[in-house]
């Protein structure tokens, strides 16, 4: 038996270079226009633009010094601090879900939320005097770091070392659609895109570049679910009695009240509440009752114990990782890990007695 547990989403930026190879093989001169034509609807909330899609909420501040933030139900917030020249940027809305921050150094920064909920941040170099490096700070939750990948991209890790996003290999295009050499440099949570215009045979301005991160999702499936009803939980003892010495035989009596809580094993990052909802065991259920029992006649020194009873559920957890790229409404899922056999205990009123 296989059951869907809970989709837990970690959100981030996404790059065109990792998802639309056509731009690298046969790039279009109007790549920026194509991107802006596919932005998600956004509305002004205070001074910020807020775009919402099926699973992502993106906040695009009017102030370039304030980070762009992305969040999803059940996922960590991801913040992206944009490049800035330290001055006051002229900001305007472009497209339905994008803003342009025109800096005073010949460059513009354009964060755009795509229709499928991914975020692209374009850096535009207006002429040869514009800067050729653009630094972003990418944080997952209250911390995180970047780890370089062999393909030229990077992984964005949260403080616990779990991937919150993946940075796709960088791309840069000039006004005629020619690729311009570019690469990333990583320092902690700082991602710097270097556009090597000097290495290009010919460059027609403006040049558009886009660092990016593909969205990382997490899903947990509960599989191999098996139930044992009226199971005696010998790990939860409720009472004990012993036939006293001094006579050949005798009886003993147990009398006690008890409280027994449900128990759920969890691993791989899955929540106990999510597992419980899937297998039908409440995470914080408490059963109260009492034990009142007298043994049959037994030899002196005999002892009896009372244990909790209920339903034993055994299962395994599968952890799936999903990544959504441009042009994809739904992520592609990959199985990352399968747990050992785990168990949950759902108590009921009553007890079992044994020696």
Positions of PLM-derived features:
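Short, surface-exposed linear segments at secondary-structure transitions and domain or protein termini
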Residues: 87-92, 173-180, 285-289, 342-347, ...
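Deployable pore-forming modules of oligomeric membrane-permeabilizing proteins
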Residues: 210-259, 323-354
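Membrane pore-forming effector domains from diverse proteins
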Residues: 284-340
